[in-house]
Design a protein with these regions (language model features):
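Short coil/turn segments that connect the beta-strands within blades of beta-propeller domains
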Residues: 49-51, 89-90
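Beta-propeller blade signature
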Residues: 12-21
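Conserved blade-ending motifs and adjacent loop-strand segments that build the rim/top face
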Residues: 27-42, 72-89
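Short, solvent-exposed loop/turn segments at conserved positions within beta-propeller repeat blades
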Residues: 6-12, 58-60
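Blade-level signature of beta-propeller repeat domains, shared across WD40, Kelch, NHL, RCC1
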Residues: 91-117
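Structural recognition of the beta-propeller blade-terminating site
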Residues: 19, 64-67, 103-105
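Loop/turn residues immediately N-terminal
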Residues: 51, 59-62, 97-101
Length: 117
């Protein structure tokens, strides 16, 4: 997950992957998605069972799901201050800095460090 603080008109790669003995390779997101993410991915999670990668950006309040094999964008969802992401049985659980977690509001504030228990 990359966090770019340069000009908003730049469109840097925000998600990369690698394997032992293989150089880093970057996912090519659509320009519009990179813009909506605010050139910033604060958290990333892998759902191995479903073959998905989830990314969250609190900057513009967006989280997205990518195909784990080819990096293709599957979906985007708006969530103000989207910050935490963890795999769930079918996709991802996502939290916000404001205490939003899935469809509930919590008096506890969340950051990007969440795990499924």
């Amino acid at each position: 997950a990359c966090q770019y603080e340069g000009p908003r008109t730049d469109r840097p790669p925000l998600v990369g992957h690698f394997a032992k003995g293989v150089p880093v390779s970057y996912v090519q997101l659509p320009d519009e998605t990179t813009d909506r993410l605010g050139n910033y991915v604060g958290a990333i999670a892998v759902n191995r069972g479903q073959g998905l990668v989830g990314i969250a950006s609190p900057k513009n309040g967006l989280w997205a799901v990518l195909d784990g094999k080819d990096g293709r964008l599957i979906s985007e969802t708006v969530l103000a201050d989207a910050s935490g992401i963890a795999p769930s049985p079918k996709s991802f659980a996502v939290s916000s800095y404001r205490g939003d977690f899935l469809d509930r509001q919590s008096p506890v504030a969340w950051d990007q460090h969440i795990i499924r228990i």
